[in-house]
Amino acid sequence: MIRPGKVLVLNFLKRSLSNLATFKGSEINTKKYDLKLPNNSDSNKQYFTLDEKLKVIQYTDANEESIIDEFILPLSSGAKASDTYQKTNLSKMRNLLTTFHIDEGESLPLSKPGYIKETPFEYHSKYNSDTSYVSIPRLSVTKLLTFQWCELREFYTIFSGSPVKKETKEMKLGTEAHLKLELETHNLIDVEDIERITDEFVEKKIDSSKRHINTLADPDDILLAKDDLSKLTELLHGAIPESSMANEWMSKIISRLFTLINTSEAREVLVHGYLDFQTSHFTSNLHDFQLNQSNLVLVSGVVDYLKLFNPHDKTDYSMFEDIQDHVEFTYSSQRKHQWIDLSQFLKDIDPIIKEYSDTYKIAITDVKTRSWNKLPQQESVLQAAKLQVEYYRNMFGILAGEFDDIEIGYEMLLENAKRRNLDVDKPISIKSALALLKANHTIILKDYVKLANGEAIGFESFDRFSQERYLNQGSEYDFTKVLEGTNREDYISQIKASDKDGFDFDEILTSDILKAWKIPLTLRYFAARSSQLFHLCKPFLSDSLSIEYHNVKKNDQCFHTNYYNYNANEIDEVTAKASAFWNGTRPPIPVQDLSKCNYCDFSSRCVIPNPHKNVPGSYGSVGSKMKHFI
């Protein structure tokens, strides 16, 4: 029984297939779609008329979409739709036809229909299969490279709802290759055991508080105790998104840039910037940034590789030797651990950086993975790779204060967190603080002690804020609420017994930390330290860029490197074009190399490879009605 309204779908399918006088019964998977083909006395009959086909479709909730998928795309080549398109591509095309109200026989438009009011960026931020782009409107660096394959394809992808790409085997191999390179430079510290054990202690503490509440009789006492329990739970293992971002900034900015300055290289470093579509420029000074924040678009990226070196003598490591000779480390009583005071380190290293700033430079490299020792053939792809690393250089320079001072990096990091709906002053959970301490104790233990004691860390904006907010009223950041007395000994004992790295917490979890802190650990602290480390790199900024091509099937070896010089004017020109595209002030530019159309999900309806197709002269109403059924 065809439900009311389904006739519309059938009529739509009928019109869509009207260009096919007849087609073979073998082209339809009758079992899959529950199609009951007419009986015919001629057992050899393989053709059925369109009317016959449409009469016998028995719609059920389970097969409606599948039938539409099979019919909605023109089978111009005579091939089965299931052989030509994957499910994702069918959905992508179906969504686009619906959005653009495309009728049978019409090709996709070359510009946005007038009834769609959203710009490409607004649509990307409103209708996106990756909901994180809806909750946190932003672009990646690669999204600015709209021309790298076909701008029209990017345009269609956006208005089809930006379907998430299914990870291919090649993509997986590329991810594994990047991780392998990362681990060659940065040790992976296992914190699973400490998180698990901390969770167990936290749950014991919470259960104890709950049992205490059950012993109370006075309603006011119960209400007060429940409020205390809520705060305790949040303190011990709450603030999950803030804690996650703290880990990202600690591991992918602070730790990485500290490693760069001390050892000459770092991998996988987070960068971001803010693009003004109106001016078509990335904001690079604090005044403009604070004045126009609401009009700026967040653009994020990850630098694959940073190398700090002497371009005239790549064997020269004298700066790093001087750093090791002049920087003071503190050792534990049994010399198992060494710690550095970041505040003092930044002071001590300043004259060394000034001495070597004319000699040493930072080169920025992006790593591309291939399945064979061959570069991409398309010039647009090679050019996009170059521009991608130029964007990284541009954003790294802005965060380092290339055009302003240290404050701009700090404010941009805070704004980044706020745009992700994070509270930069919400205390990081005790659980995360302990895991971060294990993974990064060399560079943050002394900072933990400073915060606990209410001391300045040497960054004026952060210190001034902390003085005004906490030192007169205090904070509720208290490690003793989970680790005190015998709990501490038991906690450390369990960690020692299970820790795979042989890590000794006994000399780290001292009374200097296990107390009520005067200044809590927050994202604001991590933004402050991140901006200081970015600023440390400012004197070494250079025009040296490169792209490395690695073969993932030959032990990830680098088989070719392209070297470039940073060109700010080129970036400005490309950014202007990208801004006009995303802001909707110009239509997309079609591809000229038609061989690319062979790899496009929209080629069957696109007028560029099919100039004989009708360009939509008007947009019918069928598409909008189809939304109710597909």
UniProtKB/Swiss-Prot annotation:
Required cofactor names: Mg(2+); [4Fe-4S] cluster
Residues where [4Fe-4S] cluster binds: C150, C597, C600, C606
Pfam families: Exo5
Protein name, entry field: Exonuclease V, mitochondrial
Entry's EC annotation: 3.1.-.-
Record's subcellular location: Mitochondrion
UniProt transit peptide range: 1-24
Domain of life of the organism encoding this protein: Eukaryota
GO molecular function: 4 iron, 4 sulfur cluster binding; DNA binding; metal ion binding; single-stranded DNA 5'-3' DNA exonuclease activity
Top EC category: hydrolase
Subunit: Monomer.
Keywords on record: 4Fe-4S, DNA-binding, Exonuclease, Hydrolase, Iron, Iron-sulfur, Magnesium, Metal-binding, Mitochondrion, Nuclease, Transit peptide
Record-linked InterPro entries: Exo5 (IPR016610), EXOV (IPR019190)
Disulfide bonds: none
Cofactor binding: number and manner: Binds 1 [4Fe-4S] cluster.
Lineage: Eukaryota, Fungi, Dikarya, Ascomycota, Saccharomycotina
Organism: Debaryomyces hansenii (strain ATCC 36239 / CBS 767 / BCRC 21394 / JCM 1990 / NBRC 0083 / IGC 2968)
Record's function text: Single strand DNA specific 5' exonuclease involved in mitochondrial DNA replication and recombination. Releases dinucleotides as main products of catalysis. Has the capacity to slide across 5'double-stranded DNA or 5'RNA sequences and resumes cutting two nucleotides downstream of the double-stranded-to-single-stranded junction or RNA-to-DNA junction, respectively.
Family as reported in the entry's similarity comment: Belongs to the EXO5 family.
